Amino acid sequence: MTHSTQQLSPEGVAEGKRGRLIRELVNRDKTPLIILIMAAVVGVVTGLLGVAFDRGVDWVQQQRLLALANVADSALLVWPLAFIMSALLAMMGYFLVSRFAPEAGGSGIPEIEGAMEEMRPVRWWRVIPVKFIGGLGTLGAGMVLGREGPMVQMGGNSGRMIVDIFRLRSPEARHSLLATGAAAGLSAAFNAPLAGILFVIEEMRSQFRYSLVSIKAVFIGVITSTIVYRYFNGERAIIEVGKLSDAPLNTLWLYLLLGIIFGAVGVIFNALIFRTQDMFVRFHGGDWRKLVLIGGLLGGMCGLLALLHGNAVGGGFALIPIAAAGNFSIGMLLFIFIARVITTLLCFGSGAPGGIFAPMLALGTILGTAFGLSCAHFFPQYGIEAGTFAIAGMGALFAASVRAPLTGIVLVLEMTDNYQLILPMIVTCLGATLIAQFMGGKPLYSAILARTLAKQEQARATVIAQEPAVENTPQTGR
């Protein structure tokens, strides 16, 4: 009997198996090259936006302070001018948000999370200019807001802009570049590339669709945005507190205690934010005129507070190294902490375009320093350096509120360049996260997104309920 095929030898079988394995390995990762190229473009665009936004805010603040310095000798001029300038700047931000892009209000991070789940729209053509110019107004007014929220939202919208400009149709490209822009935005805001990556993977874990394509895109976008940022601003740490000593092992229990305290503080802080948001909604009732007026009053108040006690207002980055160095007494630290909690709640809870990262980091630094000074007083045998507790506190409040401990740890270490404090940071942030979870607290951004979606559904249900009434009016002839 003749055979049309020849039986393979054992060597031929092995060779064929090796060839098949190689082909499977080569074909396993078919990453669309266009997505990776566009991720680099998104990173560059976001980095440039970050540099422009950062410098724009600094310029507005400098011009405001320069104008006040020119009339500093006249009390009759400096106080009214401080109120009026900050009020007008803030009103500009509130007006743009309320009239042109309501989704640009607040941090903007929950909007990106909702967009990643296809639950919130991404209208980049109006969000980017409104968030940019509105943020210049509110942050330039000296309000207690951060720059990172606007950067994350503008970065995510930049990703969607690139998708639309280059007509990328695949859902994978739309999702990957949206996440890439968000990560690149955080990286550009804090000069913290690894924290930008972890923020998307950890904090947005419910929305982020983990795949080889998406993770590579995020890496590339973060790298390019960081390169752009460092090209213009240098490679130094964004918060310079100096090199602190490592924490002795016999003091780790104090860091755990600090984490427990911050866990409770984080839950209370989040609850107060939600109550403040509800309070402002009751005040303005959706009327944009009332909202703009409220924003003007808040901005003017921050302008006056800047003259009375400058540490109570502003983003807080300038305050962090001063507080961490132990330049305030425990009583003064607690006073500043309470004052900044109130101003943070009012500014962020009102819906002003601006983030809460920086104010939160400042609050953590202040309370952490107060705790460290207290420990140094009660436990002199440990030789405690209060600044180490300040650094741990920065990450702990973030971890308890946002419920992203790994991001909080890496973010603070990258920002301060004190990597030797990683062990006390882990202990503090883990303790804060566990206590916050035990107390039933909800992650800040996820809770804000849930509230936004609930309002969206309520508005939709109201519209649907009104439709039959419109159809049955006498004017319809029915």
Curated annotation (Swiss-Prot):
Q: Which InterPro entries match?
A: Cl-channel_ClcA (IPR023861), Cl-channel_core (IPR014743), ClC (IPR001807)
User: Organism, per UniProt?
Assistant: Yersinia pseudotuberculosis serotype IB (strain PB1/+)
Protein name, per record: H(+)/Cl(-) exchange transporter ClcA
Can you tell me which residues bind chloride?
107, 356-357, 445
Ranges spanned by the short sequence motif Selectivity filter part_1, renumbered to the chain: 106-110
Q: Which UniProt keywords apply?
A: Antiport, Cell inner membrane, Cell membrane, Chloride, Ion transport, Membrane, Transmembrane, Transmembrane helix, Transport
UniProt site positions, description: Mediates proton transfer from the outer aqueous phase to the interior of the protein: 148
**Could you confirm whether the keyword Transcription appears in this record?**
no
**Origin: domain of life:** Bacteria
